[in-house]
Amino acid sequence: MAKFKIRPATASDCSDILRLIKELAKYEYMEDQVILTEKDLQEDGFGEHPFYHCLVAEVPKEHWTPEGHSIVGFAMYYFTYDPWIGKLLYLEDFFVMSDYRGFGIGSEILKNLSQVAMKCRCSSMHFLVAEWNEPSINFYKRRGASDLSSEEGWRLFKIDKEYLLKMAAEE
């Protein structure tokens, strides 16, 4: 399958983006944690101040999924800032449906993301990968990615909404 196109997502792609987010979550054994809705995606990514950007991989009709989907992959990203090195492209989610892997779709998405990062003068692209996800780790390493958790010893933390509310209310 040589025919596919990578393009910026539009608001009308949100149902497909949500479908792929859920497929990725299932692949990562976390499908019960997706609480986002299609409406959230539309408001958060396509409003006046988008919180994320998204690329989608679209195949022609002859390669649609058995369920009739033309969108078979996506990458959700946003820009952030590191006071040591400057602008970063943060890759939040990246997924290609299993039946469509091995055709260069993921590589082309990553190429497009790299072009976006260079156009915006980003110093690097950051992302997380589950420790058990060797295929993805190898995919990224083949393209020059370094594992900061082992090289620099960083740990990822989060503060849930419950605690954010508590801290915000403190006097």
Swiss-Prot record:
Pfam families the record matches: Acetyltransf_1 (PF00583)
PANTHER family, per the entry: DIAMINE ACETYLTRANSFERASE 1 (PTHR10545:SF36), DIAMINE N-ACETYLTRANSFERASE (PTHR10545)
Active site residues according to the UniProt entry: Y140
Sites where the protein binds substrate: Y27, E28, E92, H126, F127, L128, E152
Entry's pH dependence statement: Optimum pH is 8.5-9.5.
Protein purpose: Enzyme which catalyzes the acetylation of polyamines. Substrate specificity: norspermidine = spermidine >> spermine > N(1)-acetylspermine. This highly regulated enzyme allows a fine attenuation of the intracellular concentration of polyamines. Also involved in the regulation of polyamine transport out of cells. Also acts on 1,3-diaminopropane and 1,5-diaminopentane.
Subunit structure: Homodimer.
A Gene Ontology term for the protein's cellular component: cytosol
Stretches assigned to coiled coil: none
Family to which the UniProt record says this protein belongs: Belongs to the acetyltransferase family.
Pathway(s) where this gene product acts: Amine and polyamine degradation; putrescine degradation; N-acetylputrescine from putrescine: step 1/1
Reaction equations catalysed: an alkane-alpha,omega-diamine + acetyl-CoA = an N-acetylalkane-alpha,omega-diamine + CoA + H(+); spermidine + acetyl-CoA = N(1)-acetylspermidine + CoA + H(+); spermine + acetyl-CoA = N(1)-acetylspermine + CoA + H(+)
Domain N-acetyltransferase: 4-170
GO BP of this protein: angiogenesis; polyamine biosynthetic process; putrescine catabolic process; regulation of cell population proliferation; spermidine acetylation; spermine catabolic process
UniProt signal peptide: none
Protein's name according to its UniProt entry: Diamine acetyltransferase 1
Compartments, as annotated in UniProt: Cytoplasm, Cytosol
